[in-house]
């Protein structure tokens, strides 16, 4: 994984990076007739860099728009979900990424959405021509 370049290796078969397409996703074992319009949740938590994550992919116009990672190494009660955001901040720090970093290819954010009570690491890919 080279997060500073937007490259996230889910496993040997699924490597998400700038300009990753839905057509490429369809060639992986994770494709189960999803339409590429709605959010795609991978069925099982995935181990990335020795941590367990719930992984979601968002495509826009056939290209990756966002990869969302929710670390599920630890269980949090509904009222403590915001503490998961602290864990995500720590993970990004361990990877050498400053909070809410912008890159040429996109940006990485650790967010806590109070309205939906969800914490996640969002890797947003800018559309390229």
List the predicted regions and their residue ranges.
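Short helix/turn-capping signatures at newly exposed starts of structured segments
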Residues: 1-106, 110-129
């Amino acid at each position: 994984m080279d997060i500073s370049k937007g490259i996230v290796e889910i496993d040997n078969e699924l490597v998400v990076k700038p300009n990753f397409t839905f057509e490429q996703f369809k060639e992986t074992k994770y494709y189960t007739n999803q339409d590429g319009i709605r959010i795609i949740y991978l069925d099982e938590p995935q181990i990335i860099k020795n941590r367990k994550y719930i992984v979601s992919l968002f495509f826009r116009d056939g290209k990756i728009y966002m990869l969302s990672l929710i670390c599920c190494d630890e269980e949090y009660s509904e009222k403590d979900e915001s503490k998961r955001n602290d864990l995500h901040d720590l993970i990004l720090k361990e990877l050498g990424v400053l909070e809410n970093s912008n890159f040429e290819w996109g940006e990485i954010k650790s967010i806590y959405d109070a309205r939906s009570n969800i914490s996640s690491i969002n890797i947003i890919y800018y559309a390229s021509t």
